Amino acid sequence: MYTLYGIKNCDSVKKARQWLDKHKVEYQFHDFRVHGLTPEQLQIFIERAGWESVLNKRSTSWRQVDEGQKADLNAEKAAVLMLANLTLIKRPVLVAGEQLFIGFNAENYQTLL
């Protein structure tokens, strides 16, 4: 079974859930706001996709991050920031076995069928 990580009211997460439901793909939904995220879970995302892909620099949350924290960012500092503010993680994150998908893209999800 796959796990879809995100926030219930996020538009991209809604699209991903609708796509998975429509194509009858079994998955478990993990809401960051309800269940949180462990450092180990985030580390898996970072190892498979790279911290630059996981960190959402387009989010309103990113714009609120102090400039000092943005300077000299690396994987370790980014992980600390993302764990402190889960809305900095690009959504949704779909873990499908060894595959990991960041953001919703129907063409990429098609490979699951």
Give residue spans per PLM region.
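Local sequence-structure signature of Cys/Sec-based thiol-disulfide redox active-site neighborhoods
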Residues: 1-18, 22-23, 28-32
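Alpha-helix C-terminal capping segments
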Residues: 20, 112-113
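Thiol/selenol-based redox catalytic cores and closely related redox-interacting motifs
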Residues: 32-112
